[in-house]
Curated annotation (Swiss-Prot):
Biased composition (Polar residues): 413-429
Residues that bind Mn(2+) 2: 102, 317, 363
Reactions catalysed: O-phospho-L-seryl-[protein] + H2O = L-seryl-[protein] + phosphate; O-phospho-L-threonyl-[protein] + H2O = L-threonyl-[protein] + phosphate
Family in the record: Belongs to the PP2C family.
Record: residues binding Mn(2+) 1: 102-103
Cofactor: Mg(2+); Mn(2+)
Entry keyword annotation includes Hydrolase: yes
GO molecular function list: metal ion binding; phosphoprotein phosphatase activity; protein serine/threonine phosphatase activity
Species of provenance: Arabidopsis thaliana
Comment on bound cofactor: Binds 2 magnesium or manganese ions per subunit.
Domain PPM-type phosphatase intervals: 67-372
UniProt protein name: Probable protein phosphatase 2C 52
Keywords linked to the UniProt accession: Hydrolase, Magnesium, Manganese, Metal-binding, Protein phosphatase
InterPro entries: PP2C, PPM-type-like_dom_sf, PPM-type_phosphatase-like_dom
Length: 468
C-alpha cells in the first residue's frame, strides 16, 4: 500500500538523524516510515486501488473471513445499491476495517462501490501521514529538550490511547472529506443527485473507532452480568429531524419537512424547489444539497471493548426498517454457525418485510458481522450455493461480472396515479415491476408504494420562485 506497513502489532517506526542508521521506536501499534525517501504520494493511491482485488484478507462480496461474515441480498427495487467490506490485517495484524455503504439516487450503486473501494485506502494514507508528522515533531522536540523535561512533556501529552484516538479521529475526518471531494470531481460518475451512506468501524486491539454518515447503523452485542445478550447502538442515525442536523440545514437555507403521505420521514429539500427530498442529513455525494446543509463530515466516536463484548453488526437500513437492535443481536447470537450469521440475519429481515409490509417492496439488505474473539466455525457451511440468486445477479465487486453501468432508474412521486412512474434508463435484466428506488428507515406500509431515500426530481431554478 506504499510506505512501511508493519506485519506485526508490535511494529516500529524509523527516522534518520545526522546520517546515522534508522532509529526504531514502537508507536501506537502501527508501523510507519518517516524517512522522506519513503514518503507516500498520491501515486501510491493509484497503485493501491489497482491492486485491491489481490489484497489478502479483504472481502467485499457475500463470504466469510477469519473473524467475520458478510452477506447482501437485492431487494425488489432494482439493482442492489448496497456495498460492504471487511479488511483484516488493515495496516497491521491487529487492525480490522469494516464498512457498509447504502447508495441512493440514479447512480447510488456506483457511488456506494466507489466509496467502499477508495475510502479505506484514503483512511490508511491519512493515518500514516499524520503519524509520521507527529513522530517527526516528537523527535525534534526530544532532541532540543533535556531528557528530564522531555519525559515530563510526554507525560503531559497524555496516554497512547488518547494519541491514538486523536490520530484516528483526524484521519477519519480527512479521509471522508477527501472521498467526497473525489466524488465531486469524478469525470464519469454523476453524484449531483446520487450519493451513499457510510457506517465504518476500525478495530485496533481493544480500541474501536467509528466514523458514520447517513442512516446505516452499527450495534454491539454483549453479555451482561447474567450472561444474557444485550444490544448497544454504536452509531446515530443521522436523520434531518435531529435538532443539530435540522438547525444546520435551515441555517444554510435548506428546508426540512415530511411529505403528507409519509409524515414520519423528514427530508431535505432545496430552498425554492420540492426536490430532491433526501431522507438523511449527511451523505457522500448529493452535491445538489451540499450548499444547503447536507455534509459529509462523519460523526466520530471511540469505545474501549471488554471481554463481555461478543460481536459487532453493521447493516443498511433494509435491516433496521424491520428489525430492532435487540432482535438483530438475538438472531446473530442464535445462528447455527458464525459463518452463516450474516445470511441468517438477512433472511430474517426478508421474512419480516413480507410479514409486516406485504404490499411494500423489500429494500436491499447488507450485513457485516465481526466476531470480537477472532474465531469462526471450523466447518465451512457458507458455500456459494447458499447465496441468493438475486445477489449473484447483481454483484460485480471484483470486476468479474459486468453490470448495466449507469442503468438505475429513480422514482418521482408526483400524484396518486403516478406513484410508480419511473424516469431514466430501464434495466433489462430485471422485471418491469422492479422500480429503481431505495427505502429509508422506519418505513410504514404505503399500499405498495415504494419509499425512496431521495425523491430525485431535477431541480427547477425558476426566477419567479427565487423572487418570492
Amino acid at each position: 500500500m506504499g510506505g512501511c506497513v508493519s506485519t506485526s502489532s508490535k511494529s516500529t517506526c524509523s527516522s534518520w538523524s545526522n546520517g546515522e542508521k534508522p532509529v526504531r521506536r514502537p508507536y501506537l501499534g502501527i508501523g510507519c516510515c518517516v524517512s522522506k525517501r519513503a514518503k507516500r504520494t498520491f501515486s501510491d493511491h493509484i497503485v493501491s486501488l489497482q491492486n485491491l482485488t489481490s489484497i489478502p484478507n479483504r472481502i467485499t462480496s457475500s463470504s466469510k473471513s477469519r473473524s467475520s461474515c458478510i452477506f447482501t441480498q437485492q431487494g425488489r427495487k432494482g439493482i442492489n445499491q448496497d456495498a460492504m467490506i471487511v479488511w483484516e490485517d488493515f495496516m497491521s495484524e491487529d487492525v480490522t476495517f469494516c464498512g457498509v455503504f447504502d447508495g441512493h439516487g440514479p447512480y447510488g450503486h456506483l457511488v456506494a462501490r466507489k466509496v467502499r473501494d477508495t475510502l479505506p485506502v484514503k483512511l490508511q494514507f491519512f493515518f500514516q501521514t499524520l503519524q509520521s508528522k507527529q513522530n517527526c515533531s516528537k523527535g525534534t522536540r526530544f532532541r532540543r529538550n533535556s531528557s528530564k523535561s522531555a519525559v515530563q512533556e510526554a507525560v503531559k501529552e497524555g496516554s497512547d490511547e488518547d494519541k491514538l484516538k486523536g490520530l484516528w479521529g483526524e484521519a477519519f475526518l480527512k479521509s471522508f472529506k477527501a472521498m467526497d471531494k473525489e466524488l465531486r470531481s469524478h469525470p464519469n460518475l454523476d453524484c449531483f443527485c446520487s450519493g451513499s451512506t457510510g457506517v465504518t468501524i476500525l478495530k485496533q486491539g481493544s480500541n474501536l473507532f467509528m466514523g458514520n454518515i447517513g442512516d446505516s447503523r452499527a450495534i454491539l452485542g454483549s453479555k451482561d452480568s447474567n450472561d444474557s445478550m444485550v444490544a448497544t447502538q454504536l452509531t446515530v442515525d443521522l436523520k434531518p429531524d435531529l435538532p443539530r442536523e435540522a438547525e444546520r440545514i435551515k441555517r444554510c437555507k435548506g428546508r426540512v419537512f415530511a411529505m403528507e403521505d409519509e409524515p414520519e420521514v423528514p427530508r431535505v429539500w432545496l430552498p425554492y424547489d420540492d426536490a430532491p427530498g433526501l431522507a438523511m442529513a449527511r451523505a457522500f455525494g448529493d452535491f445538489c444539497l451540499k450548499e444547503y446543509g447536507v455534509i459529509s463530515v462523519p460523526e466520530f466516536t471511540h469505545r474501549v471493548l471488554t471481554d463481555r463484548d461478543q460481536f459487532i453488526v453493521l447493516a443498511s437500513d433494509g435491516v433496521w426498517d424491520v428489525l430492532s437492535n435487540e432482535e438483530v443481536v438475538d438472531i446473530v447470537a442464535s445462528a447455527t454457525s458464525r459463518a452463516s450469521a450474516a445470511r441468517t440475519l438477512v433472511n430474517s429481515a426478508a421474512r419480516e418485510w413480507k410479514l409486516k409490509y406485504p404490499t411494500s417492496k423489500m429494500d436491499d439488505c447488507a450485513v457485516v458481522c465481526l466476531f470480537l474473539d477472532g474465531k469462526m466455525d471450523s466447518e465451512s457451511d457458507y458455500d456459494e450455493q447458499g447465496f441468493s440468486s438475486a445477489t449473484n445477479a447483481v454483484e460485480s465487486d471484483d470486476g468479474q461480472r459486468s453490470e448495466p453501468c449507469l442503468q438505475r432508474n429513480f422514482t418521482v412521486r408526483s400524484s396518486s396515479d403516478q406513484e410508480n412512474e419511473t424516469y431514466g434508463n430501464v434495466n433489462t435484466e430485471t422485471d418491469a415491476e422492479d422500480e429503481k428506488t431505495v427505502g429509508d428507515q422506519n418505513w410504514l406500509g404505503l399500499q405498495g408504494v415504494t419509499r425512496v431515500n431521495s425523491l430525485v426530481q431535477l431541480p427547477r431554478f425558476s426566477e419567479e420562485k427565487s423572487k418570492t
